[in-house]
Amino acid sequence: MWSRLIQIFRPLRSFRMSHSPPPASNCEEALIQLKNFGYAFDGEGVLRKVDPATGEPGKELFSYNVSDDAAENEKHYQKLANQIPEIVYALLEKNGLSRTYIPFDQPPERSSFVFSQPAKLSQSKKLLVLIHGSGYVKAGQWARSLIINNSLDHGTQLPYVRQAQKLGYDLLITNANDCTRFYNGKENPIKGVNTSVEHVKYVWKNIVLPAKPESVAIVAHSYGGSLTLDLVERFPDFFKESVFAIAFTDAAMGSPQAKNKEYLCDVACDWVASNTPLDTPVSQSKSSIRRISAGHTKHEWTSYSAIDSVFKFIEEKYEQRANKK
């Protein structure tokens, strides 16, 4: 599967450490920057140190510690991690998704973007929307620490993309942390989508609603849970009519409004970090969203570890919806 990534760019035999590489502007540039750090993804999507003798990914995994200075280690990690988004974007496109630049009235170089399949959503029979958490992650990522320390499959949304495609879903992938662009010598907020909340609101109002999908499911990780609740509050009629399943993975969110609690308790479930086996019920009140174990104790692992249970839940909810019609 990940051999396709190696075909995009094969690391050169010689490489040097770059002291201050900027974030890459495309996938090839990102892979070159990784090579300058001495790393490359192997055919299984695992980030490994490049063997100087062969120029190919070797056996050694990523090492966080490059210095006795903790600040220098973190600086090195952040610079390397800055190369991840463009690689993931390219993989989304290789898996059949297309970019849509937002807001629509801005030039691409001053816009954010989302990914979808098909390129223009229209009356989807089944639509799956993926919403990541806060921080540095961009479209297609759940946890960049897992991408760097484990594999692309562990930390990206690509396993969700592939499973959704197998099950016949159209796809929409948000990019809620992509809120600024550098020009005129500084970082500038992107007009109309300058915060995560504004980003998902714009996407919902200008892409999802006009597309008039028949049935919608959402998977939202961490702060994506709060963004989803905000959407429910802004577009309650659409949600209650069309959104049949909401899968949270260790969501960071407050209590839903009283008027939406019954609906959310019916369609939503939260897979939380827990030391109990996958799907084990976790304590909750009768008036709250169902919470079950994601099968892992760490927050950043929950989307990866719960994927089979998440899709089982979504498919069962879709079957219930279909049987009501």
From Swiss-Prot:
Pfam families given in the database record: Arb2
Biological process annotations from GO: regulatory ncRNA-mediated heterochromatin formation
GO MF annotations in UniProt: serine hydrolase activity
Superkingdom field: Eukaryota
GO cellular component: nucleus
InterPro entries: AB_hydrolase_fold, Arb2, Arb2_dom
Disulfide bridge map: none
Family of the protein in this entry: Belongs to the FAM172 family.
PANTHER family reported for this sequence: FAM172 FAMILY PROTEIN HOMOLOG CG10038
Name listed for the protein in its UniProt record: FAM172 family protein homolog CG10038
Species of the source: Drosophila melanogaster (Fruit fly)
